[in-house]
Amino acid sequence: MKILYSLRRFYHVETLFNGTFVLAGRDQETTGFAWWAGNARLINLSGKLLGAHVAHAGLIVFWAGAMNLFEVAHFVPEKPMYGQGLILLPHLATLGWGVGPGGEVLDTLPYFVSGVLHLISSAVLGFGGIYHALLGPETLEESFPFFGYVWKDRNKMTTILGTHLILLGLGASLLVLKALYFAGVYDTWAPGGGDVRKITNLTLSPSVIFGYFLKPPFGGEGWIVSVDDLEDIIGGHVWLGFICVLGGIWHILTKPFAWARRAFVWCGEAYLSYSLAALSVFGFIACCFVWFNNTAYPSEFYGPTGPEASQAQAFTFLVRDQRLGANVGSAQGPTGLGKYLMRSPTGEVIFGGETMRFWDLRAPWLEPLRGPNGLDLSRLKKDIQPWQERRSAEYMTHAPLGSLNSVGGVATEINAVNYVSPRSWLASSHFVLGFFFFVGHFWHAGRARAAAAGFEKGIDRDLEPVLYMNPLN
C-alpha cells in the first residue's frame, strides 16, 4: 500500500490518490501535494511552474480580448457606456481612444483592434504555457541558469523583484507617453464638458505629488483618491515609473541587507503571501478610486459617482423650480434650512436638502457655477448652460446604487431606470477580491512563518473516516 501522507512537515494536507494516473514529478507521492493543490505540485519544478504562469497570463489576456470584442459587438453608440453594462470600453475611452468632445464615441475601430490584439497575444501566451507545461524542461536551472532559481536564494529573489519593478515602471511610463505624445487622454475637466487632449504642463513638484500621500483619507481630503487634475495624475505616473525603474535597478544590483534577511521569510509560500498583500492593497485602492473619483474614472463613461448623482438631483430641481418662479436663494425647506441653497460648516454656499452631506463634491458640470464663496447665486440665475442641465438630469437618474441583480437606481426615484452602474460593479468586485486576497495573505503568511519556525506539523489524518473506505477505482 502506498504511503497516505508525506513525512515532510510542511506538506500537511494529504488525500487518497489514484496510483494509476501519474505524471512524473507531479503526483502526490513525489511532491507531497494532491492534484487539487494545483501549482503547489510545481514548487520545485521551475520550468513547469513557468508554464503554469504563462498559461495563466494567456487566460487573463484571452478574457480581456474576448470580453473587449463582446462589448464592441453589443455597443450602441447612441447610449452612454455606463448604461450598457460596459467595463472595458470605458477604460479604452478614458485613454482617449475613439472618443471626442463630451465623451461621444466617434469610432469603434480602436476598440475592435484592442480586442483582436489581446486575442492574438493570448494565443502566443497559451502556446508558450502549453510548451513549458508539457514539452519544455522541468527545471530551468541546468539549461537556462539565468532564468533558474532556488526559493531560498535571497539574491536571486531580489533580482526577480527588481525585474518586475522595472516592467511596472515601464508600464507606468506608457501612460505618460500616451498622454504626452500619442493623441492625449480624455479629460473630463476640458471646457464645455470634456474632451481628448494632450497633457502639456506636467505636475512634477514632489510637494504636490507626495502631498497626496500625506493627506488624511477622510472628508474632503481623500488621500490619493482626491486627485482631480490630469496633470497631477500623469505627473504621478512619471514619478511612479521613475521610482519603480530606479528601485528595480537597485534590487538587481544589490543583495538584501542583514536586517532584511532576518525580517523576512525566504520561501515560495512567503513570496506568495507578500504578493497577495500587495494585490489586496491594489484592490482596496481601486475600489475607492472607481467609487469616488470622477477624473481618473470620468462620469461620461462610468456614470456619476454617488455624491455626483445626489448633487445632480438637487441641481436639476433647482433649475426646474427657478424657471417656475421660485426664489432659490431664499426659499425655505421643511426643516427650516434652505430648500435649494444653504451654508456649509465653513460658510460656503452649497446645495440644500439631503444632498448637503455631499457638499464636498467637485464635478466638471458644476464647477463653472462656483464663485469664491461656493455656489454663486448670480451664476445660478444667469449662467447655467443647456449641457449642464442635460448632464445633471442624466446623472440624477443613473445613481451608482442598487443591487447587482440589475435592479438599480435610487429606490424612491420615480424617474430611475433599470440600471446598475459600472461603478457599482467595479467597486464592489474589487473590494471583495481585495478582501479575499487579504485573507489569503494571512493564510499563506501564517503557513510560511510556521514552516520557517519549525512547528508546522499539519493535520493529523489518522482518524479520518475516508482512510477506511474503499478507493473509488
From Swiss-Prot:
Q: What is this protein called?
A: Photosystem II CP43 reaction center protein
Example GO biological process: photosynthetic electron transport in photosystem II
Q: Which UniProt key words apply to this protein?
A: Acetylation, Chlorophyll, Chloroplast, Chromophore, Manganese, Membrane, Metal-binding, Phosphoprotein, Photosynthesis, Photosystem II, Plastid, Thylakoid, Transmembrane, Transmembrane helix
Q: What does the Swiss-Prot or TrEMBL cofactor note state?
A: Binds multiple chlorophylls and provides some of the ligands for the Ca-4Mn-5O cluster of the oxygen-evolving complex. It may also provide a ligand for a Cl- that is required for oxygen evolution. PSII binds additional chlorophylls, carotenoids and specific lipids.
Q: Which InterPro entries match?
A: PS_antenna-like, PS_II_antenna-like_sf, PSII_PsbC, PSII_PsbC_sf
**Residue numbers bearing the Phosphothreonine modification:** T15
Q: Which GO terms describe its cellular component?
A: chloroplast thylakoid membrane; photosystem II
Which proteins does it associate with, and in what oligomeric form? Answer: PSII is composed of 1 copy each of membrane proteins PsbA, PsbB, PsbC, PsbD, PsbE, PsbF, PsbH, PsbI, PsbJ, PsbK, PsbL, PsbM, PsbT, PsbX, PsbY, PsbZ, Psb30/Ycf12, at least 3 peripheral proteins of the oxygen-evolving complex and a large number of cofactors. It forms dimeric complexes.
UniProt lists the family membership as follows: Belongs to the PsbB/PsbC family. PsbC subfamily.
The record describes the protein's role as:
One of the components of the core complex of photosystem II (PSII). It binds chlorophyll and helps catalyze the primary light-induced photochemical processes of PSII. PSII is a light-driven water:plastoquinone oxidoreductase, using light energy to abstract electrons from H(2)O, generating O(2) and a proton gradient subsequently used for ATP formation.
Q: Which organism is it from?
A: Triticum aestivum (Wheat)
Where along this sequence does the record place binding of [CaMn4O5] cluster?
E367
Which Pfam families does the record match to this protein?
PSII
Q: Tell me, what is one Gene Ontology molecular-function annotation carried by this entry?
A: electron transporter, transferring electrons within the cyclic electron transport pathway of photosynthesis activity
Q: Which SUPFAM superfamilies match?
A: Photosystem II antenna protein-like
Query: Which residues carry the post-translational modification N-acetylthreonine, per the record?
Result: T15
Q: Where are the transmembrane segments?
A: 69-93, 134-155, 178-200, 255-275, 291-312, 447-471
Q: Which residues form the propeptide?
A: 1-14
Localized where?
Plastid, Chloroplast thylakoid membrane
Q: Note whether Repeat occurs among the keywords.
A: no
Q: Please give, as recorded in its UniProt entry, the membrane topology of this protein.
A: Multi-pass membrane protein
